A protein has these predicted regions:
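Active-site anion-handling motifs in enzyme catalytic cores
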Residues: 1-274
Length: 274
């Protein structure tokens, strides 16, 4: 069966994966492709929510409905659900998911409760692990090289911070700096700032790093592959993360983790691993 990927970087995705790729917002091309496909796989992540924007929710609901109307089976895979807060959003979500989606796999019980609150009963609903837990780590030599490139000892003892910009973060940067200083002074752990999203996360890390003074710390550059992020996580003694995937990658490597919740999806995952 031919596979087509929807992405904001079609050329890059085609080069990396060897697959046909369509730009996320090329609607005529998307519709043309769906006419020739048997399955539309939507996911993963928290796509059915309106915190990002109402347009984001409307977009994903449109793709689900369009794929079904063009004759595809429709599956939502590895999803988190909600929050949906804006007027009309819950009703629209209920209508589309009940009429257009055949099956949904959810990554935490909170999302099952959210679908029940919406009144979604049409699709088959399955609770399953987040698929990111199965991603492999980069080879040890690649991880060693990444640490040496920033002057870090591959055999050192580290505490990882995976942070992101969020409204009010600048007022909390000192809290993370104090935690990093405490980890160094009491446990001999050097703070490593690891970007999951290299644009936003690098700025958040810089805000904290400038408050550390003489406390040893390492700023890892981005972007980097998910395999390298996972490999680096595996070298940490503990991971402190705002990023959901920072927590998922740490859990997958058996590394103790501390979640800092800015979004219900982070809280929901932490409940699963508690």
């Amino acid at each position: 069966m031919p596979v087509t990927v929807m992405t904001r970087d079609p050329a890059g995705a085609s080069a990396r994966l060897g697959l046909t790729a369509v730009h996320t917002f090329n609607f005529p091309r998307f519709l043309a492709v769906m006419r020739r496909r048997a399955l539309y796989l939507n996911g993963g992540g928290s796509l059915i929510q309106d915190v990002t924007s109402r347009r984001s929710l409307w977009y994903y609901l449109f793709t689900l409905r369009a794929a079904k109307r063009l004759g595809c089976k429709v599956m939502m895979y590895g999803c988190g659900i909600g929050p949906v807060k804006r007027p009309g959003g819950v009703a629209k979500t209920r209508k589309v998911l009940n009429s257009c989606v055949d099956a949904i796999t959810l990554r935490e019980p909170d999302s099952i409760e959210e679908l029940a609150r919406f009144g979604v009963t049409g699709p088959e609903i399955i609770l399953a692990s987040d698929p990111a837990l199965t991603l492999p780590a980069a080879p040890a030599e690649e991880v060693d090289a990444a640490l040496r490139a920033v002057g870090a000892d591959p055999d050192g003892k580290y505490i990882c911070f995976a942070l992101r910009l969020w409204p009010g973060f600048d007022k909390k940067a000192g809290v993370f700096a104090a935690a990093a200083a405490h980890a160094w002074e009491k446990y001999g752990l050097t703070a490593v700032f690891l970007p999951i999203n290299h644009l936003d996360d690098g700025q958040a890390a810089a805000l904290v790093a400038e408050k550390l003074g003489d406390t040893p710390h390492v700023l890892l550059p981005g972007p980097m592959s998910s395999a390298l992020v996972i490999g680096l996580m595996s070298r940490m003694q503990v991971v402190v993360s705002m990023r959901l995937h920072g927590l998922i990658f740490a859990a997958g490597q058996g590394v103790p983790l501390v979640g800092v919740s800015y979004d219900p999806k982070v809280t929901a995952f932490l409940r699963c691993v508690d």
